[in-house]
């Protein structure tokens, strides 16, 4: 029987691992990866929303 683990090479997999093991390093890495994945930045998921918030200049709400 195979165990399906999240792919640490993707932002979603990295975020899932970070949340599962409560490791902020994985979570931050996932957010930074998502900032670079422009085609996925508008996807409706937590990691995309956090990445968009980090990209907005401070003091500028959109």
UniProtKB/Swiss-Prot annotation:
InterPro entries assigned: DicB
Taxonomy, superkingdom: Bacteria
One GO term (biological process): cell division
Tagged with keyword Glycoprotein: no
Keywords: Cell cycle, Cell division
Pfam families: DicB (PF05358)
UniProt entry tagged with the keyword Nucleus: no
Function: Involved in cell division inhibition; this function can be repressed by DicA and DicC proteins as well as antitoxin CbeA (yeeU).
Identification of the protein by name: Division inhibition protein DicB
